[in-house]
Amino acid sequence: MQINELIKYMESLGLDIHTTTKARGHQGFFLDGRIDISNSLPEERLIPTLLHEFAHYIHSKIEKNINKTGGSLKIIFDTEKNLTSELFAVTNFVDYHSKCEKLIRHREMVKDSIKKLDLQIKEEFPNFQRSKKFKEFDRAIRGTKLKYLLKYDRVRIMPWFMFGKEEVLSINTIEKDFPNLKIAFVNYIRLKSLSRKQRRISNRISKLHRYYNRPTELFARLVEGLYLDKELTCKLAPNATKRFFELLEKGYYGELKFIFDNYVTIC
């Protein structure tokens, strides 16, 4: 399939296609009759991405406000069956980032580091519990500026007076800045920092899972998967692909039928 041929057909439907933009930092996006494909995409990603965004266009004609609502599988597949797990398997094939493997590994490394620090603190304070106040630590830092490092990894403390000196505190220089501070307390500050990092990573994973599980994204990646590898996609999602082709033949997906009739062989 030639990309120019596909663009020409889509433009004949009234779509505004752009392939020389940054696509808002994404591979592509669809909004209000316009499709943008990133100018930094490698050639082999152009057609799959264009089909992905065209699938959003088709979905938007069937179901309104998908950009806000994320759509509904019941509507786009016109069924009460739960097809989510099949569709997500296709998503994992189409976009390896959807597995969040790198983030999950990073989170596990952070969790291991937290456990090690926890054990080191307990060597000196056996009753230490992360979920409870560390009273010995609170007493030790009373009247110091170390409290800021319980919330931030690096802080700039501005002077009260115009000619005072700015002070910078960092978890990387605790031993140097506070040479008399017990190692257990240094470890506690670093443990709190790692706990914040763990939460950030978990939030990132949750955000990605919400994005990849949006019905409109699951549908678009099914279309993308059928172009990339029809046989594998049908194997990963037998019920979803069967329903997709039933509706495609009935004209439920409108102009998407022309794309499949001319460029994608039904499996």
Describe the residue ranges of each PLM region.
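Generic structural signal for residues in well-ordered beta-strands
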Residues: L15-T20
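Hydrophobic (often cysteine-bearing) scaffold residues that line and stabilize catalytic clefts
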Residues: Q2, I47, Y212, T216
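Active-site recognition of the HExxH zinc-binding catalytic motif
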Residues: P48-K61, A220
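Zn2+-dependent metallopeptidase catalytic core
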Residues: M1-G14
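Post-HEXXH active-site segment of zinc metalloproteases
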Residues: E44, S60-R105, A237-T241
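Short, exposed beta-strand/loop patches in secreted or surface proteins that constitute
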Residues: G25-F30
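Short pre-active-site segment immediately N-terminal to the catalytic Zn-binding motif
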Residues: L31-L51
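Pan-zinc metallopeptidase signature
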Residues: E101-C267
